[in-house]
Structure formats: structure tokens, C-alpha cells
């Protein structure tokens, strides 16, 4: 189709104004569109917070911390708080005093900031040298090239067990000269109970399976092990199944991953499976077998009581924060963060694993200003109706701060995140 001479001026005009309208969109608005597409909880445009909001700035006529307190007071006047709640506690670790408190004792669902509670409890109970172990054992004897007996893969709930570890298991048998297993191959999953999911998990979520013997995050360890044995030319005469390893069994090889390796992914990427693995390590450390989530709850409660709070006020159901039954407070999270800060054996393992604002993990796309970037180190949390953030930062006066912010009853988590980011910016900005 050809344009006649009457259509050309209109076409040119429309093209010109379309170009101008696109070119004149503010940079922050274009960025906002990209962020809303990437935002998992909603594609609804965020209208409650304006990036140019004057409330974002501190009152320079007031001294620290009054200027911070005034600015946060003004943030709390936002319309979102007419229909939602926030619990918040900000603590100056150098001055050993509270900077700001608001509903800090109100019970709320922590979402994935529960992982910080799990991490601190684990480091306190297990220590920074703890390792997640998976064993390969056998019973019977090795006669020539034949293992006459049974082989046991003993799970210690290591979520990082991978292809290299599996190959190491197979290679260990090859180095013993074994080309035939005249017996069965068993999965020993006795380390924990048989519950495949956490208490209070939503049935329609994509939840991880809580097995103590995993391969590549799946409960298919024995199937893959047998397949790798066959590829290596090792023949099995028996069957596969689940059975606890006898005390008399011989250990062929053990594969380990450190607690630092687990915490790094658990906190930076908010990995729920890793958090539950840590929680069951806490439970197993009590000496109970099989370990249960209830055993871990008790350890968490013991730590809370030791820190001077009443553990019976809170509810714990899992280690990841997926459960609908977890209820904590900003006061509790800050008390645990203070405890970790005062204990270098905990802090040296916790701090490097927390997401860093504007740099990595779940904070990579948040708080990119010069004052917050690489400064705020905190754990994020998001479940339906809840957005949370807790961790550490260095304030504008050089003081070390720990904080917890839990937004509850919000339809769109982005609104909670923006409030949290502004609070952190107020603390960091000169």
C-alpha cells in the first residue's frame, strides 16, 4: 500500500511525536518498568512510593539520631500504613542503644528472615567448623573383585552433594578393585524423620523435598548411584531399597561440605532447601535420631531464653520461613543480630553470607545509591502479604547498626521493599 500526499504529513507528525514521547520518559521511569517485569510478586505498577519523595531526605537541622527518627516518623505517614502493619527496631551497636522502635514486639511472620534465626542458632550450636557429611559404607568382605555384602549410602542432609561427589563414591569402589557387588544397595535416611515437607507449607507451592540423602536437590540418590556404577562397569546382583546402616559397617569414603558453603547460598540466594538442611543439622546435634523439626525448635527456644527473651511468645515451624506458622518479632531478630555481632565466632561466618546491597544475592538490584551500595548487608524475606529485611549497616556517623523491618498485610511486596530501602538510606545518607 502506498501513502498518498495527503497521508504523508500526518504519518511524519505521528512518528515525530512518538519518538519525542519515548525519548522524554525519565530514566527512573524506564528503570521502573524493567524492575516491575522482573518483580516476581506482582506486575502491578507501584504508586505508593515516589522516587522523588521529599520525605526520603533527613532533616538537616536536627542532630543524630533525632534527624533519623524524624525522617522515619514521616515515612510512616505513607498511605500504605492505613491498611498494613510494620514492626521495626533499629539498634546502634556502638552506642548500645535503640535508635528507633515501632511495634517491635508485635508478632509477625518473618518470611525468609527466618533464615537469619536459623543461621545464628546453627553457628551457636554447631560452630563455624561444622561439616555436612555423606558416607559410603559396606558390610561383608571383598573377595577378589567381588564385594560380598551390602552397600550403604548414608545421608547427612547435604544439599550440595553433586556430580563430583557421586563420581568420588564410584571411584572409591573402583580403587578397591570392586567390579561386582554381590548384595544390595541401600539408602540410609535414618538421620531425620520421614516428613517430606515442613509444617505449615502451602500444598500448591513448589516446595523442596526434605530428604537427608539428595542428589542435585532431588530424592533420586540411589537411582543415580546405581546408574553411575553401571556406567563404570560395576555389576550389582541384588536390589535397591532403604535400610539403616549397621554399626559394624565399614566406611569407604565420606564427602563433606562446610557450613560456610551452605550458609552462602542459603542466605545470599534465600535457598529454602539449604535452610531446612541447616535446621535438621541443628536437630541432629541434640543427639536425637531420627531428628525432627521439633528438636530444632527447642534449640532455637533455648537460645532465645538465654538472651533474656521469653521463647514461649514465639512460634517456630521450619528453618526457611516458608511456613505459615512462624511468628516472631522485630525485637527478637534484633536481639539475635546483637548476639551474633558480639560473638566473632558467629559474626565471621554470618556476615560474609548475607546479601550485599547493590552487589549480590537478593539485594543485588536494591539500594544502589553510593551510601547504601556495599554498605547494607541484610537478609530479605517475601511471602504472600509479608516483606521483611534484617541485618547490618554502617550509619552516616560511622556507627554500626543492626535492624529488623517486617511489613505485614501488604498486597504488593514491592511497597514493603521500598519502605525498607528508604529506612536504610535514611540511616546511611549523610
Where are these regions (language model features)?
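Bacterial Sec-dependent N-terminal signal peptides
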Residues: 1-36, 42, 47
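Beta-lactamase-like hydrolase cores
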Residues: 32-94, 100-107, 171-177, 429
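Second-shell loop/turn segments in exported
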Residues: 54-63, 101-109, 151-160, 170, ...
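Active-site SXXK
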Residues: 96, 110-128, 185, 224-228, ...
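Active-site-adjacent, His/Asp/Glu-enriched structural segments that form or flank metal-binding
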Residues: 131-193, 200-208, 214-215
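A conserved catalytic-loop motif detector
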Residues: 152, 168, 190-232, 254, ...
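A small/polar active-site loop signature that marks catalytic segments
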Residues: 218-351
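C-terminal soluble interaction/assembly domains
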Residues: 315-430
Amino acid at each position: 500500500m502506498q501513502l498518498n500526499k495527503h497521508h504523508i504529513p500526518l504519518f511524519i507528525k505521528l512518528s515525530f511525536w512518538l519518538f519525542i514521547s519515548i525519548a522524554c520518559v525519565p530514566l527512573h521511569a524506564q528503570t521502573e518498568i524493567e524492575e516491575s517485569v522482573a518483580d516476581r510478586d506482582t506486575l502491578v505498577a507501584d504508586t505508593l512510593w515516589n522516587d522523588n519523595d521529599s520525605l526520603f531526605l533527613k532533616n538537616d537541622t536536627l542532630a543524630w539520631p533525632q534527624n533519623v527518627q524524624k525522617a522515619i516518623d514521616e515515612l510512616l505517614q505513607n498511605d500504605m500504613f492505613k491498611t498494613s502493619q510494620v514492626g521495626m527496631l533499629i539498634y546502634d551497636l556502638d552506642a548500645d542503644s535503640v535508635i528507633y522502635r515501632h511495634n517491635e514486639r508485635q508478632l509477625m511472620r518473618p518470611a525468609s528472615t527466618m533464615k537469619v534465626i536459623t543461621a545464628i542458632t546453627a553457628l551457636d550450636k554447631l560452630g563455624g567448623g561444622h561439616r555436612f557429611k555423606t558416607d559410603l559404607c559396606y558390610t561383608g568382605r571383598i573377595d577378589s573383585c567381588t564385594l560380598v555384602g551390602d552397600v550403604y549410602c548414608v545421608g547427612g542432609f547435604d544439599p550440595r552433594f553433586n556430580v563430583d561427589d557421586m563420581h568420588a563414591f564410584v571411584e572409591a569402589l573402583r580403587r578397591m578393585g570392586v567390579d561386582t557387588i554381590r548384595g544390595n544397595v541401600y539408602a540410609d535416611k535414618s538421620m531425620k524423620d520421614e516428613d517430606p515437607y515442613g509444617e505449615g507449607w502451602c500444598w500448591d507451592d513448589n516446595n523442596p523435598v526434605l530428604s537427608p540423602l539428595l542428589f542435585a536437590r532431588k530424592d533420586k540418590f540411589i537411582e543415580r548411584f546405581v546408574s553411575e556404577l553401571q556406567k563404570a562397569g560395576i555389576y550389582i546382583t541384588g536390589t535397591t531399597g532403604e535400610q539403616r546402616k549397621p554399626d559394624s559397617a565399614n566406611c569407604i569414603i565420606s564427602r563433606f561440605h562446610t557450613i560456610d558453603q551452605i550458609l552462602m547460598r542459603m542466605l545470599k540466594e534465600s535457598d529454602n532447601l539449604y535452610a531446612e538442611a541447616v535446621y535438621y543439622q541443628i536437630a541432629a546435634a541434640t543427639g536425637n535420631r531420627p531428628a525432627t523439626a521439633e528438636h530444632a525448635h527447642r534449640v532455637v527456644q533455648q537460645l532465645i531464653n538465654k538472651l533474656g527473651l521469653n521463647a514461649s511468645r514465639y512460634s517456630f515451624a521450619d528453618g526457611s520461613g516458608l511456613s505459615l506458622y512462624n511468628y516472631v518479632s522485630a525485637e527478637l531478630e534484633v536481639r539475635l543480630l546483637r548476639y551474633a555481632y558480639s560473638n566473632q565466632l558467629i559474626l565471621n561466618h554470618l556476615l560474609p553470607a548475607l546479601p550485599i546491597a547493590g552487589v549480590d544475592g537478593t539485594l543485588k538490584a536494591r539500594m544502589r545509591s553510593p551510601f547504601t551500595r556495599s554498605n547494607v548487608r541484610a537478609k530479605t524475606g517475601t511471602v504472600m502479604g509479608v516483606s521483611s529485611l534484617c541485618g547490618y549497616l554502617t550509619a552516616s556517623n560511622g556507627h554500626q547498626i543492626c535492624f529488623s523491618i517486617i511489613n505485614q498485610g501488604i498486597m504488593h511486596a514491592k511497597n514493603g521493599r521500598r519502605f525498607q530501602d528508604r529506612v536504610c538510606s535514611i540511616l546511611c545518607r549523610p
